[in-house]
Amino acid sequence: MLKPSIDTLLDKVPSKYSLVILQAKRAHELEAGATPTQEFKSVKSTLQALEEIESGNVVIHPDPSAKREAVRAKIEAERLAKEEEERKIKEQIAKEKEEEGEKI
């Protein structure tokens, strides 16, 4: 018998179609170098994805529009953090130039 069993996996997702999509997407992520959420018994990324689904570490987002909004918010926060860092660097450069001008 294969582990994890299909019955156990179907308790974690709404349908077998959702299971296949989730497994495929997670396997692609793992192949692309995504950080695993646990230690695996399997070597293949497809079986590793099933292990993560079985353990509940990987789930389907219940509301796709909420997920998109969360991704947008994360990107916006990263952009704002980058702008703040650039502003601080510019202030530091201006301060150093000002101090250099006073010494001359």
UniProtKB/Swiss-Prot annotation:
Signal sequence annotation:
none
One GO cellular component assignment for this chain's record is: DNA-directed RNA polymerase complex
Kindly state which keywords UniProt assigns to this record, in alphabetical order: DNA-directed RNA polymerase, Nucleotidyltransferase, Transcription, Transferase
Q: Record's Gene3D superfamilies? A: 3.90.940.10
According to its UniProt record, this protein's enzyme class is transferase
Query: Pfam families under this entry?
Result: RNA_pol_Rpb6 (PF01192)
Q: Which InterPro entries match?
A: DNA-dir_RNA_pol_omega, Pol_omega/Rpo6/RPB6, RPB6/omega-like_sf
What Enzyme Commission number does this protein have? Answer: 2.7.7.6
* Gene Ontology terms, MF aspect: DNA binding; DNA-directed RNA polymerase activity
Which transformation does this protein catalyse, written as a reaction? Answer: RNA(n) + a ribonucleoside 5'-triphosphate = RNA(n+1) + diphosphate
Kindly list the cysteine pairs connected by disulfide bridges: none
Does the record's keyword annotation contain Transferase?
Answer: yes
GO BP, one annotated term: DNA-templated transcription
What SMART domains would the database entry show?
Answer: RNA_pol_Rpb6 (SM01409)
Q: Which NCBIfam families match?
A: rpoZ
Regarding protein family, the annotation reads: Belongs to the RNA polymerase subunit omega family.
Assembly mode: The RNAP catalytic core consists of 2 alpha, 1 beta, 1 beta' and 1 omega subunit. When a sigma factor is associated with the core the holoenzyme is formed, which can initiate transcription.
What is the annotated role of this protein in its UniProt record?
A: Promotes RNA polymerase assembly. Latches the N- and C-terminal regions of the beta' subunit thereby facilitating its interaction with the beta and alpha subunits.
Q: What is the protein name for this chain?
A: DNA-directed RNA polymerase subunit omega
